[in-house]
Amino acid sequence: MRASRGEITIEEILQESGLNFKEEYSFPELTAPNGTPLRFDFAVFDDDWDLMFLIEYQGRQHYEASSKFGGKKALYRQQYNDNLKRRYCGLHNILLIEIPYTDEHLLSFDYIMHRAGWC
């Protein structure tokens, strides 16, 4: 899948910061109803590679139906999967940072650290 502008910006911020991270991170037990693994855009790790937090960039298709992304049916599926991810993180005490597309212009290392509660 092609990365969005927001995802590219986040990747650049993580690379420049020197943080350990992986893209398209998934957990074996977290799947969509059809069995497809649900992936998080980024997983950020400490120096021992213990998970610190996950980042999800939420493009417009997470909030609005768009024919470009499959219309209302795709929107409902996207929102359902987003809720599965939120529940999973809550149940496993994993910090999930969701960045809406409306905040794309605010993206910076400080923005991410603030959202993680470290500023």
Predicted regions and their residues:
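Nucleic-acid endo/exonuclease domains
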Residues: 1-119
